[in-house]
């Protein structure tokens, strides 16, 4: 008598359509460079290459991109004017603003974030310098991939499959003469440190500016009694503007850290773009120590140097917070903070723009709490007031 044994079928791995990226920039050189980088990646494709914001607004419904790289300065319709029109036509479009490092463009980039842009990326002054071009390429592809993960489409197969929209290229003008939800699997939580914290450290990246402004507005009672040190992945000029926004949001003094500056309660210190911010003991004082060394975790400033250096000064009396951001910066430093007896809190997945940095900390099992952004401030106020629950 033979017995038929049914073999268990192994499900095919989920496959996704390449991310469709719309590149909008009036420079044919920049468009060409970005397009070549994107086309070289297996998980993304250039859906449209366009010269003006007006072209983008007119074609977005037909092109159906997942991500738009939108230059700020363009003829006919600039990026900040095109932004709300694009989102009105495609609500879930991920828009990354691109601009050169000027104060005006930094201000516009912050305005764009408040209008619905997902992120920004600084363009190098010249793409002829190999190192600058490579940093731009790395950051751009990482942002497209991380932010685009929220809208990736599964591959459709079978008779009902719908063809992807056509690829659109810019028509060059004639030359002018002379001119989340939170994770389903529970994550390990650690007990809060028994040591009362004497400093608040915060690390953030993508989505960080908006998250930081929300958080500092909620923790005035903490800022008044303790120093707050922040590292946000951000270039020079942009950090200057961010410090001004943090001062307005918190109604407390906030500025970029200055090398050798004595750290005092009642102040918010922000790592300046292009330099790591550490802390050190100098005589009887605790001071800011700026570091112009190499990037850490592909970032400068990076969160880990701040977290790790703080242990030498405050030992177990540290409260570290990891907010939204891509990558894993802050996880290693957070581990060291916890090993020294301090505490770490991470933003939850549902309220994060990208759950990379806080997710890395959460999955490492080092967090005393994993909370929505709007609950972190309340938790910090209680902890700094003596609550250890």
Curated annotation (Swiss-Prot):
**Residue positions, PTM 4-aspartylphosphate:** 71
Domain CheB-type methylesterase, first and last residues per copy: 193-387
* Protein name per Swiss-Prot or TrEMBL: Protein-glutamate methylesterase/protein-glutamine glutaminase 1
The entry lists its GO molecular-function terms as: phosphorelay response regulator activity; protein-glutamate methylesterase activity; protein-glutamine glutaminase activity
Q: Name one GO biological process term.
A: chemotaxis
List locations, semicolon-separated.
Cytoplasm
| Annotated EC | 3.1.1.61, 3.5.1.44
Annotated catalytic residues: 205, 233, 329
């Amino acid at each position: 008598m033979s017995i038929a044994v049914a073999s268990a079928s192994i499900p095919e791995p989920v496959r996704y359509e390449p991310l469709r990226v719309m590149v909008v920039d009036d420079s044919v050189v920049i468009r060409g460079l970005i397009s070549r980088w994107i086309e070289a990646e297996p998980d993304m494709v250039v859906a449209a290459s366009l010269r003006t914001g007006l072209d983008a607004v007119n074609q977005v419904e037909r092109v159906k991109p997942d991500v738009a790289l939108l230059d700020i300065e363009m003829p006919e319709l600039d990026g900040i004017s095109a932004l709300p029109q694009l989102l009105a036509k495609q609500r879930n479009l991920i828009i990354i603003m691109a601009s050169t490092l000027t104060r005006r463009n930094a201000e516009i980039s912050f305005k764009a974030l408040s209008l619905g842009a997902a992120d920004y990326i600084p363009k190098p002054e010249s793409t002829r310098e190999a190192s600058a071009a490579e940093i731009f390429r790395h950051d751009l592809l990482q942002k497209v991939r991380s932010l685009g993960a929220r809208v990736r489409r599964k591959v459709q197969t079978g008779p009902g499959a719908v063809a992807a929209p056509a690829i659109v290229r810019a028509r060059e003008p004639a030359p002018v003469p002379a001119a989340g939800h939170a994770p389903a699997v529970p994550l390990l939580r650690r007990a809060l440190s028994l040591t009362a914290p004497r400093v608040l450290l915060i690390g953030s990246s993508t989505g960080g500016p908006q998250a930081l402004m929300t958080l500092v507005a909620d923790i005035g009672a903490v800022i008044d009694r303790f120093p707050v040190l922040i590292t946000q992945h951000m270039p020079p000029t942009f950090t200057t503007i961010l410090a001004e926004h943090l001062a307005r949001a918190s109604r407390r003094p906030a500025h970029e850290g200055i090398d050798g500056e004595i750290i005092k309660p009642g102040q918010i210190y922000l790592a300046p773009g292009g330099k790591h911010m550490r802390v050190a003991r100098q005589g009887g004082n605790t001071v800011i120590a700026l570091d112009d060394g190499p990037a850490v975790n592909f970032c400068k400033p990076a969160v880990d140097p701040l977290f790790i250096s703080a242990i030498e000064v405050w030992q177990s009396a540290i409260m570290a917070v990891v907010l939204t951001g891509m990558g894993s910066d802050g996880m290693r430093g957070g581990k060291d903070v916890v090993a020294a007896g301090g505490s770490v809190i991470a933003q939850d997945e549902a309220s994060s723009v990208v759950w990379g940095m806080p997710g890395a900390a959460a999955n490492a099992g080092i967090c005393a709490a994993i909370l929505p952004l709007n609950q972190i401030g309340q938790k910090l106020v209680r902890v700094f007031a003596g609550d250890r629950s």
